[in-house]
Amino acid sequence: SAFASPADDKQAEANAALEKLNAYQAELDEASGNYQNALQEQLDAEAKVDEAQKQIEEKTTEIQGYQEQLGDRARDMYRSGSTTFLDVILGATSFEDFATTWNILEDMNQDDAQLVQQTKTAREELEAAKTEAEEQAKVASDKAEEAKQVADAADAKAAEMQAVYDGLSAEAAELVQQEQAAEEAAQATAAEEAIASG
């Protein structure tokens, strides 16, 4: 017929709702993808923090080792009656020999002190890197939280439109059935009238 039936109108509404639903679903897919990416960034940043912490602990252990080494040697050198100290004095055949041995010991101590300093500097750099990684992790965490809210909102919109579409589809199907039943009834009535008038 030239006029759209109520079922056609309802089906057109359902089709429009389906288009919106598909658009919302695409939004949801994108938002979910963004959330997954943000979450991965957060995990990566947190892994960097853990790695930096591990390296800091290793450097701290190194520093302690060097400091103990320095302390032991200093005690050996300066403690009265120390074997090393006596060896330096008694083992020296001349003053030049004594001075050379003493200088070697001092150089060793300076080398150790330098090692301690270098290791401390390395630890400070690691601590700075850890702080930076923690800041990145915080930013990534905020981004992930924001992305999750967007995804949740998109999910709610899609679910709402799904319900609208399902409702309209059901109504359209019901109207089609009613129209078919009415048409069948009209045909039956027309047939009865034809028989009666025949």
Model-derived features: positions:
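Active-site helix-to-loop segments that bind/position phosphate- or nucleotide-bearing substrates
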Residues: 94
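Alpha-helical oligomerization segments with coiled-coil/rod-like character
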Residues: 2-76, 102-198
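Envelope-exposed proteins and targeting segments
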Residues: 82-86
